[in-house]
Amino acid sequence: MERALAIGEEASRRGIEHPNLLGLAAQKHMRAGDSERAYPLLLRARELSPHNADILNDLGLCLVRLSRAREALSTLEAAIREKPDSARPHFNKALAHEQLGELDDERRELERVVAIEPRHHQALSLLAMLAADRNDYKATRDYAGRALALSPDEVPAKIALVSAEIGSRDFNAARLRLEALLRDTDLDADNRALAQTLMGDVLDGEGKFDEAFRCYAASAETQKTHYARAFGASGQESFRAQIERLQSYFSSAPAEIWNARKNDAQTPVHVFLLGFVRSGTTLLGQVLAGHPDIEVMHERDCLNEAVRDFIVPKDGLEHLGALPDEALMPYRRSYWQKAYAWGYSAERKVFVDKSPLATSLLPLIARLFPDARILFVYRDPRDVVLSCFRRRFAMTEQKYQMLTLDGIAACYGSLMGFADFWREKFRLDVFDARHETLLANFESETARICDFLSVALDPAMKDFASRARVANIDIPNSADLARGLSRKSEGHWRNYRNELMPIMPALAPWCARFGYPEN
């Protein structure tokens, strides 16, 4: 195979255009991790041979690796039409759905892969992980067992079994499996960080909180080292610096133009579900999603063009404030077109955009959607910071800054301060939703939220846990959500009081602001 790849690359270098040779040259680049160089070769190969299933499949995979999963889907569907009994395009289509957070669609494609090729150990491993996320531990063990029988070194299958063992409180079995994984010097950085986090969860479950904290810290350090080149000195404006710049601008900006509410009868009622990560936005989003008149969009970036033009440039806010309303229409259309592309219809009475960190984009929301309502979720700041430290997120520049307790506390303070500033200066239609109140008084608090959204309380909203057990949800705590309402994590920060002590002064004003007692 290596010889064939080399021949393909040499032919490409000489300008010889044959689809199979171009495909081989592209594969060589992709194996080297250079999908950018592979992409034009595969495009040309498709032009020369538009019905070649192998070329279409490789192009689809290349698009996934370039983070262009939505484009990849149509290409992979074309590959499947040409060769419906091939497992490869179905597997790559599953990877595209995973990248898009469409985990139920990912599961369906993986099941098709296994139906076509029962010994596909990678598909079995991913099915095991999805089952663990749903708390379906019987399916987890079945899929993982089959994967490991075919490929004893299949790391995702081992990780899935660990998740099932932790969920079943079989901490000793989970520890033994994790110790073996962590001894593997070839374990890649992402899986090592995940294994360290899971070891922390094992120790946390056993009440060994000081040891658990050291594991979480080790996981953060692994991620920090691994992503240092990409995010450590990216040259981008940091999340906190951006918020400080926005707040500085609005300290002297006239309020009138940013308060231009139309009070039009909106169809649908447009709502932004904001807060800070790990504050309870996911739980509330899933509760709202059970209502027949509410559609919830989960963390999809539909404002990226407006961010590019008005938030990133230093003079962007001044430009945004000066634009007449009609000049903003293309950005509104772009927002809704992106929502439709993600599969949302916006045809129900209420459309909820759940985007916790979009709290920093309140200026855009105010100008583009002046009649939007804001559901602002908050939770004990100490539990929020601890939860962020214990969980792993898809890495971004913002998340890279949140790999230490100091970094999380600083980002929290900046974002909450910005939200408070906007409340005081600008007229926002805001409902404050306290996470602990939703847990303690579910029905009455849900009724209050429904009243704010102009819909009646619906009994189906209680069934979020059963929906989570059937569906896969693209969030770090999907397994917790599948267990239903639980107050066991409330006040969990007390178990890590000593470790959190250095950041307590930074969090104290916010504990007081939201009414959480010192002890």
Residue ranges, per PLM feature:
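Conserved phosphate-donor/acceptor-positioning beta-strand/loop module used by diverse small-molecule
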Residues: I365-C388
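Short beta-strand segments
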Residues: L273-G275, Q286, H298, V350-S355, ...
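PAPS-dependent sulfotransferases, especially Golgi type II membrane carbohydrate sulfotransferases
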Residues: Y143, N172-L182, D186, A193-T267, ...
